[in-house]
């Protein structure tokens, strides 16, 4: 979904063309394993007239990346390289080659050519005409792309168009059904635009099955071309329901569709005998020691104390797990930056004295797309509380740096921009608080929310602490020993606050209702000592003060 944010320049660059090479890599997510929707970004290829390449496997992904750079440089146009989940998550041995970077390097000079680079109407109109001509030529010539091809038997009367990873599924399905000498397989790695020569190869067989992940984009192009040339071929795929319009494909699903077209009997392989047993539920949880847990715990307590039922506008990050019990502090999760944006509208229509609006957003997401909606909140006077969860990194996707980390993607130091600087610059009152300090959190959140309710204006709280995974890594690097915590047997009353309300994964309930801490899971954050009403939790031994410093300040290296 990241290409949505870059769509505006993509359309414009398609008009102007590029110097050097520009390859946009888009990782689509069929079945939405980690995305909020299942969009197929090949539509951008059609919409913006951008050549779209789909690798069929790991080696192809390597070759496709090289070829994408070469074609972009040769055509002087942007190229979209599309991957899907199985391609992105597959490993295999690679045959490495050499990319001639010198050949791909731009000149390093800016060519003053306003008629090309300024998209005012009189120039943009000319660009569109050239773009349409380029697109027509590309449809005629792109069939010779090295990763395209035709294999199998011509004149068999049945063709499979395998697109990207769909080509691999198609080959396995053909083998499973024993149709190797009875089918023509058309391998399409340039899915947009569909090469006309490959389309003709498929249509000549009379029966065609299009296998592609995502939307029926190649299928739609093929059907349009068939109408254009008057072909009577029957084309099957997703539009007729033979293949599913949602989720990932599987060999079994493709084999069942192929068997149906070929008139074969085929029973899809099912799982083993149903023993009537269910695996124990394993819901995703925030890590032991995660700074989000004390924030959400404190937020719930403050809302209860002020006798309000907030509407929580969430965002994209590890903190999306706040939707789950016992916290349930995510009522809306739409897209990156959607928290403050949604809160803007809600704050104007809800009775905030009973249902105050609280936006929850991470630091990297705030820099990415949270600043503009906060500006709108100021401009439109939206009474909302925005909580920026600052863990000094982009945790969910692999600890990438951002403008608040003081480090660039190449590892070099960079100016560090605190969220508070930005918020103050927008004229918004901002509070900063230690995310591991329960008392400080509750006091700060209560003051901030009360100010929103009384003064009806936006207020921001920045809750700060390190991602526990980064902190643990830093501690190991420094040779620091992490001291776990334990339950003091005689003091625990079995109230359940630590394992039910605070819900630390390292703490469990014993048969007698008392708490028990697993030292293998405990990260030594010590927040449980603050939430226990009976002072029944303590460290196993002396805690090195350096650890508490690292917990609050560690950043990825």
Please annotate each region the language model reported.
Residues 1-65, 71-74, 82-87, 107-108:
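Active-site cavity-forming subdomains of large catalytic enzyme subunits
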Residues 1-3, 26-28, 54-59, 187-188, ...:
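Active-site nucleophile and cofactor-binding loops and adjacent substrate-binding regions
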Residues 1-4, 26-32, 58-59, 85-87, ...:
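Acidic, glycine-rich active-site loops and adjacent beta-strand->loop/helix elements
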Residues 23-27, 80-84, 161-162, 211-212, ...:
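Short beta-strand segments
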Residues 27, 46-54, 277-282, 320-333, ...:
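Glycine/charged-rich beta-loop-alpha catalytic/anionic-binding loops adjacent to active sites
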Residues 31-34, 323-462, 468-474:
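Thiamine diphosphate
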Residues 269-340, 349:
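Active-site diphosphate/adenylate-binding microenvironment
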């Amino acid at each position: 979904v990241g290409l949505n944010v870059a769509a505006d320049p993509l359309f414009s660059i398609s008009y102007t063309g590029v110097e050097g090479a520009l390859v946009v890599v888009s990782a689509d997510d069929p079945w939405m394993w980690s995305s909020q929707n299942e969009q197929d970004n090949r539509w951008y290829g059609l919409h913006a007239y951008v050549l779209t390449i789909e690798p069929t496997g790991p080696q192809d992904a390597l070759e496709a990346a090289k070829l994408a750079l070469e074609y972009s440089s040769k055509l002087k146009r942007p190229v979209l390289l599309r991957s899907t989940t199985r391609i992105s998550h597959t490993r295999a041995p690679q045959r490495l080659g050499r990319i001639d970077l010198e050949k791909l390097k731009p000149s390093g000079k800016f060519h003053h050519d306003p008629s090309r680079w300024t998209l005012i109407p009189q120039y943009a109109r000319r660009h569109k005409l050239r773009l349409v001509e380029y697109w027509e030529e590309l449809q005629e010539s792109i069939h010779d792309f090295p990763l395209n091809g035709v294999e199998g038997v011509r004149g068999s009367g049945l063709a499979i168009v395998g697109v990207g990873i769909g080509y691999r599924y198609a080959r396995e399905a053909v083998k499973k059904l024993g149709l190797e000498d009875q089918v023509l397989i058309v391998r399409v790695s340039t899915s947009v635009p569909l090469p006309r020569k490959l389309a003709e190869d498929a249509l000549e067989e009379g029966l065609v099955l299009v296998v592609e992940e995502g939307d029926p984009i190649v299928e739609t192009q093929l059907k349009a071309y068939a109408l254009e040339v008057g072909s009577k071929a029957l084309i099957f795929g997703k539009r007729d329901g033979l293949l599913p319009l949602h989720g990932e494909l599987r060999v079994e699903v493709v084999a069942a569709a192929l068997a149906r077209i070929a008139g074969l009997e085929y029973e899809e392989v099912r799982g083993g005998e149903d023993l009537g047993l269910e695996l124990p539920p394993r819901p995703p949880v925030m890590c032991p020691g995660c700074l989000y847990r004390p924030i959400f715990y404190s937020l719930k307590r403050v809302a209860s104390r002020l006798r309000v039922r907030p509407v929580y506008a969430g965002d994209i990050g590890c903190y999306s797990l706040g939707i789950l019990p016992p916290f349930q502090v995510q009522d809306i999760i739409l897209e990156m930056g959607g928290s403050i944006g949604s809160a803007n509208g809600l704050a104007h229509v809800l009775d905030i004295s009973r249902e105050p609006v609280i936006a929850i957003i991470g630091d990297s997401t705030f820099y990415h797309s949270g600043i503009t909606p906060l500006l709108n909140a100021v401009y439109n006077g939206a009474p909302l509380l925005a909580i920026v969860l600052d863990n000094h990194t982009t945790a969910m996707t692999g600890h990438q740096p951002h403008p608040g980390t003081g480090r660039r993607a190449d590892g070099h130091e960079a100016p560090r921009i605190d969220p508070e600087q930005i918020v103050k610059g927008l004229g918004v009152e901002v509070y900063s608080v230690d995310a591991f300090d329960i008392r400080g959190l509750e006091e700060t959140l209560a003051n901030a929310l009360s100010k929103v309710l009384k003064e009806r204006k936006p207020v921001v709280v920045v809750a700060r602490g390190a991602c526990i995974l980064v902190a643990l890594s830093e501690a190991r690097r420094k040779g620091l020993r992490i001291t776990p915590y334990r339950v003091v047997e005689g003091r625990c009353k079995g109230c359940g606050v630590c394992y039910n309300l605070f819900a630390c994964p390292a703490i469990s309930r014993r048969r007698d209702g008392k708490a028990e801490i697993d030292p293998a899971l405990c990260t030594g954050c010590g927040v449980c000592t603050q939430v226990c009403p009976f002072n029944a939790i303590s460290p196993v031994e002396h805690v090195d003060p350096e650890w508490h410093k690292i917990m609050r300040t560690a950043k990825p290296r």
